[in-house]
């Protein structure tokens, strides 16, 4: 009798667990991404490879900055933010946001994120202190703000003496063109191209690299989605790294990526060429003891913000 009861109870528990797993599986996956920020997995996005691997629809929504991605995740509208800037993520977890960093989208120099001064202003690296007292456009709470702060250290200008105006990249580029600001810090190939049509980079890509200014974009996820759908999250990251490997092998469809990024092919190739897409092993090293770990420590990021267990190692 005890054996029968034990079998029945065991069966009930097993059934309950299987139902729980089934019920927790998401009916769709909602992903945030950026336009003008080309990445290999956009080919998979367009060709439905994520849907095939996950078995559910994937809804992609473009955002203007990483802070907006965080807001959407906290509102319950986004599950995964792909290529979110590290700075907005750090700001979020410092405020105890229930988010986790689970992958590195890419590392990059200042080709894709930079500060541009207008030619009309006559301001360059050599006389950068003249930015003080002037209006500058910066998308606050993003990697571009980090680049702004680090660039000001290099040229010896005091941020507190500038009129810093919150503007997303497209707005900042337009303000630079119209003369409303003397400098715009921005990201995204189209916005940078518009800005450099009337201005010049305050620091060249090489000067920024020499100064140790490195950008890192990450993949973040809500704690809720991670706990309820660990298999889906792991699959999403696997597909992403497969796309990166295809790109490294020179087998990506660049025309598809350019079209999805809403960029001209030449501009897209120039932008993506400045990105470094890490292998899973390189990603783990960066997250535990490399560039990412150093960045997190330097910005006093709370412990427990990173989870490497979903990497396809």
Please identify what each model-predicted range represents:
Residues 14-23:
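C-terminal segment of classical bacterial N-terminal signal peptides
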Residues 1-9:
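Bacterial N-terminal signal peptides that target proteins for export
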Residues 164-165, 170-257:
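Pocket-lining segment of extracytoplasmic ligand-binding domains
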Residues 53, 72, 76, 91, ...:
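Structured segments of extracytoplasmic/periplasmic soluble domains
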Residues 227-301:
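Secondary-structure end/capping motifs
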Residues 26-155, 163-166, 182-189, 202, ...:
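Short, glycine-/small- and polar/acidic-enriched structural segments
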Residues 295-313:
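Hinge/cleft segment of the Venus flytrap/periplasmic-binding protein
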Residues 46, 65, 69, 88, ...:
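Stable alpha-helical elements in mature extracytoplasmic
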